[in-house]
Amino acid sequence: MHPEPSEPATGGAAELDCAQEPGVEESAGDHGSAGRGGCKEEINDPKEICVGSSDTSYHSQQKQSGDNGSGGHFAHPREDREDRGPRMTKSSLQKLCKQHKLYITPALNDTLYLHFKGFDRIENLEEYTGLRCLWLQSNGIQKIENLEAQTELRCLFLQMNLLRKIENLEPLQKLDALNLSNNYIKTIENLSCLPVLNTLQMAHNHLETVEDIQHLQECLRLCVLDLSHNKLSDPEILSILESMPDLRVLNLMGNPVIRQIPNYRRTVTVRLKHLTYLDDRPVFPKDRACAEAWARGGYAAEKEERQQWESRERKKITDSIEALAMIKQRAEERKRQRESQERGEMTSSDDGENVPASAEGKEEPPGDRETRQKMELFVKESFEAKDELCPEKPSGEEPPVEAKREDGGPEPEGTLPAETLLLSSPVEVKGEDGDGEPEGTLPAEAPPPPPPVEVKGEDGDQEPEGTLPAETLLLSPPVKVKGEDGDREPEGTLPAEAPPPPPLGAAREEPTPQAVATEGVFVTELDGTRTEDLETIRLETKETFCIDDLPDLEDDDETGKSLEDQNMCFPKIEVISSLSDDSDPELDYTSLPVLENLPTDTLSNIFAVSKDTSKAARVPFTDIFKKEAKRDLEIRKQDTKSPRPLIQELSDEDPSGQLLMPPTCQRDAAPLTSSGDRDSDFLAASSPVPTESAATPPETCVGVAQPSQALPTWDLTAFPAPKAS
């Protein structure tokens, strides 16, 4: 195939043999039918042209030249090729459309990129009727022509060409932007035919005088004008620019006229009333106001106007900040109102529940109130559990531990097992109101008790302030808790524990208690003047203590450990299930867990069974109860066939009317590995067995652990397993 006219031939021989083709096409373009027939002959037999002998090629060239009447035109085809640039042919335009992924059909394209192609002439654009943007910059175009078919054109880019005159733009009635920068234009002309021309760029041309730009007065719609880097030097050009009603953007940089106009920016801003952008920066309203003030009164007026503008700007900023602060303040007020409403609702709901914290009527802090409520709940549940576990005793019996009221009214009596106290003496709980409180008898197995300790509180509606925690009362005198108000909840006895753990929940330091000797007992009293500084201490135990942690009282000198180094725990009760269904259902319970959290748990948390059987327990005064223990063992051996409960009621009495001492649990001689070790942690403190008969009251095999010599234990494996209830 023959090469395109715009593509240079490559190869030495091929270039010499086929050099006549450009001449053929050119003649065809210049001479219609004759050249067109010659071209068809060459196309039909290309091999003869390119492969044939040099004589045949020469004759063909002579024949073409004879037909065209130009005798020496093809004598030097390579030189002619170098003189002329690429042409804007239809085939080359189609190739460019394909290269830029445009439509092959010319009329469908609205944009055509013909920049940087080296074209020197605008031609063959008749079929591109739908063009809206035509890029022709950076070519060698010398004349604006052949644009009659581009009636829809909006943007025409002809910068960086060889144009010397503005012409042939009449068909472009919809042209909006025209770029003629970097050309050789000396006069602006022939633009009045463009009714909607908005942007004209004439930078880097040869405009010099006022007459060269005088035609701009006829461009009434021109808004953006770029005349930078020309040779304009006459200040009278401002009169031409003033006559342009819609001029908004003006660029005069690079012209000598800038140096010829005094106060150039102020002057241009004042004279061009609608100018918003001058040269390289905008014209702000403040700049225009200052320029107008300068035109009226000079620099002083300009300074005053500038200060006014600055004050207005500062005031505007201040107003904005104040508005934001007001919005924030209103939001905070609404938040405070919501919070106050919520607090008011909470206060109204708590008015009936709040109790004064002191005798003076001061309100109790929230933490103290919560502690007091938990302590009252604990004491109440303690007495309820005592009433459920202990039956009433017949009247007339004098219990060693009593709970009395100061009004002396009749009170029901009840008993608690001896396991509720650990190495402590009877505890007396007294109140001042007239309500009858249940009177409980708490037998003790420990040696003779020391004097009791009494803790008084001055507020009847709350727990006595300055209450000492149970951990500080190990082997201490009994605690007497007295109330002075009739609204006082029933209070119970708190077992004593070792002193090492600090009191939990204490918020302030307690005042030093005073020991007062009254009636042969030691009473701990608190200074009444500092009652408001006292605080009820929550009796909480974070750790679970076992019976193995009890101190060895008799071996204290041998071991060298003080009682303060031993960790004590609350007494625990283990109840062995009955042998048959004849046992008392009220006493047929498994075990009571250890007291872990006084404010929240019930009295059942006081008692628990230790899982550690590493140490052997023993009870002092074994010689005293040895006889009764042997008798109990004989009775059990004689009456093994008769099933009966293992726990005896504490209310049983001796016929003489005196309370019998509890027997010890005699173990077999053979040591037990499992049940024996587990039961060795406790020894029962219960009533003696009355008679040897089948209908004997239940016996007990529950005891309080004492650090002493190991004792023989019962063989608990001989009893059958308890039946499921």
From Swiss-Prot:
Expressed in which tissues: Mainly expressed in trachea and testis.
Entry keyword set: Cell projection, Ciliopathy, Cilium, Cytoplasm, Cytoskeleton, Disease variant, Kartagener syndrome, Leucine-rich repeat, Phosphoprotein, Primary ciliary dyskinesia, Repeat
Domain of life: Eukaryota
LRR repeats: from-to residues: 107-129, 130-151, 152-173, 174-195, 196-217, 221-242
Keyword Cytoplasm found: yes
Subcellular locations according to the entry: Cell projection, Cilium; Cytoplasm; Cytoplasm, Cytoskeleton, Spindle pole
Biased composition (Basic and acidic residues): 38-48, 76-86, 330-345, 360-408, 481-491, 632-642
Gene Ontology biological-process entries: axonemal dynein complex assembly; axoneme assembly; cilium assembly; cilium movement; determination of digestive tract left/right asymmetry; determination of liver left/right asymmetry; determination of pancreatic left/right asymmetry; epithelial cilium movement involved in determination of left/right asymmetry
InterPro entries per the UniProt record, alphabetical: Cilia_flagella_integrity (IPR050576), Leu-rich_rpt (IPR001611), LRR_dom_sf (IPR032675)
Pfam families named in the record: LRR_9
SMART domains listed in its UniProt record: LRR_SD22
Disease: Ciliary dyskinesia, primary, 13: A disorder characterized by abnormalities of motile cilia. Respiratory infections leading to chronic inflammation and bronchiectasis are recurrent, due to defects in the respiratory cilia; reduced fertility is often observed in male patients due to abnormalities of sperm tails. Half of the patients exhibit randomization of left-right body asymmetry and situs inversus, due to dysfunction of monocilia at the embryonic node. Primary ciliary dyskinesia associated with situs inversus is referred to as Kartagener syndrome.
Known role: Cilium-specific protein required for the stability of the ciliary architecture. Plays a role in cytoplasmic preassembly of dynein arms. Involved in regulation of microtubule-based cilia and actin-based brush border microvilli.
Name of the protein in its database record: Dynein axonemal assembly factor 1
Organism expressing this protein natively: Homo sapiens
Originating gene: DNAAF1
